[in-house]
Amino acid sequence: MSNVSQPRAPRCALVVLGVSALTSLLAVPAFAGQVNLSGLDSQPTLERFIVKYKDGSSAAVSPTSMRASLNSVASTMPARAGRALGLNHVRRTALGSEVLKTDRGLDRAEAETLMRRIAADPSVDYVEVDQIMYPVLTPNDTRLSEQWGLGTSSSSINVRPAWDTATGTGVVVAVIDTGITSHPDLNANVLPGYDFISDATRARDNNGRDSNPADQGDWTTAGQCGSGSSASNSSWHGTHVAGTIAAVTNNSTGVAGTAFNARIVPIRALGACGGSTSDIVDAIVWASGGAVSGVPANANPAEVINMSLGGSGSCSSSYQNAINSAVSRGTTVVVAAGNSNANVANFTPASCANVISVASITSAGARSSFSNFGSTIDISGPGSAILSTLNSGTTTPGSASYASYNGTSMAAPHVAGVVALVQSVASRPLTPAAVETLLKNTARPLPGACSAGCGAGIVNAAGAVSQTP
């Protein structure tokens, strides 16, 4: 949904998403900050929030002033069991907002009260929930013998003719996901990445952020992710997504990648029970070549970011600012539309401006029953029964394997791969807005039904490559 076009540095400088209105913003006192309530229903209890203080305000420049402001707000909140609420500063994000954490979980009403009281400070620009995002897939135990999405049917992405002239050479795709596992059909195309999970428990490596993006497993036990949550095996979601983009090809092994000569920068932001918005937005900035405090510079800035993740609610300021930051550096941001069979306007970050929002279709060319839809879907890609690289471990990593998954998580990397193909043959790197326009103008009609909005059609690799300037 591009609405800006930004210049891009020449490719030789590389080794290798305007702010939308927030429909859930509600009125607050005059001169106070905006309150985005869209994340309040995302979790049964809430304890992490993101606050952006206005540039130049005392709270923005003085930790002591910010601490005094937070203590003042906390003192107005009702005590529980005789204990006052604690409100602590965790860290500053790459774009200058502050991550806050309460010392106990709050219900929806308590969290809304806290957010409104924080926003009543005239120095606050906005406040929102540090929402948890999740991989956007529906696992399928059936393994297919072929990759229909890369085939020759009218429902495929029509990639085989494109491979005669474009294979993704020289293009870096950042995959913000669960990390990656070692796989003989992937390893040769993987560059150094980073682990952005700041919560050591969620990360399972006991040390928070570090330079190792290896997927430690995202298995959960019953109740671990909230009351009533079920147990689940590790998904190895990032490995599956990466394989669809750039699995090694012509090696007489396994599967093919859409852009099989592109390189993957794996960025770990999802762990046990998902991943926090504050970690993901830092990952977006870093992936595109921006600076993140305490994290070494990314030696391989991405021309494409794939985010097969999301959660409920409209686009938050944190997401939009991070996406705009990436787009300003020339990085195209591809996002899964979500698997709720609902309007994408209520799913984030797919509802953000300046992203390519991707719906899922079946091998018959119809909208997948689970796929989100709507007027802001940009394009569709194969997302039902998609075979790709995986791992056999049910909890911690086991041996390399292959499996079929369903989800808009699987559709998005097909599109990200096509973007890599396009950039690899462009005479100079295309702006994100130009990439989106090219994909829409060359898309093929869906041969099946989608009455609710599936964008311009099925992404058409050969058509896009042939019309790349």
Where are the regions that the model predicts?
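Protease zymogen maturation seam
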Residues: 35, 91-95, 115-172, 180-189, ...
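Active-site-adjacent substrate-recognition loops and nearby beta-strands
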Residues: 280, 314, 335-355, 359-377, ...
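Peri-catalytic substrate-binding/gating loops that frame the active-site cleft of hydrolases
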Residues: 178-231, 260-273, 345, 391-406, ...
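C-terminal subdomain of the subtilisin-like protease fold in secreted/lumenal serine endopeptidases
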Residues: 266, 286-289, 294-309, 315-318, ...
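Hydrolase catalytic cores
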Residues: 242-246, 258, 265-273, 305, ...
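Bacterial N-terminal signal peptides
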Residues: 16-25
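Flexible, small-residue-rich helix->loop connector segments that border functional cores
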Residues: 158, 162, 176-186, 215-261, ...
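Primarily auto-inhibitory N-terminal propeptides
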Residues: 28-148, 163
